[in-house]
Amino acid sequence: MTLLDLSAFPNAQMLYPAAGVMMAYLITKKGDKNLPTAFYIFFVALTAVLVVCTAASVLAPQNRDLMSMPYSQWAPIMNYVIIGGSVIFWILLLQSGKEMRRSYGLNSEHWNISIRMILLFIGLYLLRFVIACALSGQLSEFGKIMANPTTWIIFFTVLVNFFLSVVAFFGEEYGWRYYLQPLLQKKFGLKGGVILLGCVWAVWHLPIDFFYYTTPDMGLAALASQFVTCISLG
């Protein structure tokens, strides 16, 4: 049996929530002067391109063996599309103007809080690592890691990579958190809305839980873990 590289599926799926919201707005709000039409049309078109690449990765896989694992030649193409799409994403987002961004949840009013949360996450992550090293009697190793230039190169690479792959992360956050979460919280309350959102978000992962993250026989276990993750992080 020929194995397929299914990595294209989650890459495309991450854009679906935001693309769905944008398509709805393009249809129902087309008379609104504050609608970021160009930005929305581009994102929907980008999603369509990734869907085509995903279908092609199955219909014309052109797989190669990479360390005994299937590697589709469509994988780098998908990466190029995401990187190029992210660059255009930033350009169109900035060109849309503050009023359009503010009207459709594309402009944060609390950057200072976001930066503080990022710094808090980094601080807690490092603290966890320091405690683990201290408990194992390897605290000196932490100092060596932090003094290694490679550590900082990787850190800044991850930072740059976020901006060059932002469309994937934006797809879920805009669709679920900006649009669906407030809608559910309005109908079912703050806690009920978050719990229901987590359930919907978890079920949304079902295809890749069964056919990408794990094998079908382990799909239910993966789906159960998604419920825990999506509800607790919601």
Predicted regions and their residues:
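Membrane-interface interhelical connector segments
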Residues: 138-149, 175, 180-182, 209-221
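Specific transmembrane helices
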Residues: 1-169
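Membrane-interface helix/loop boundary segments of multi-pass membrane proteins
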Residues: 123, 170-198, 212
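Membrane-embedded glycan transfer/ligation machinery
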Residues: 13, 17, 173, 177-178, ...
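Hydrophobic transmembrane alpha-helices of Major Facilitator Superfamily
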Residues: 158-162, 166, 170-175, 203-206, ...
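Short, motif-level signal for alpha-helix interfacial/capping segments enriched in acidic residues
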Residues: 146-155, 182-186, 224-228, 232-233
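Functionally important transmembrane alpha-helices
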Residues: 1, 191-202, 215-234
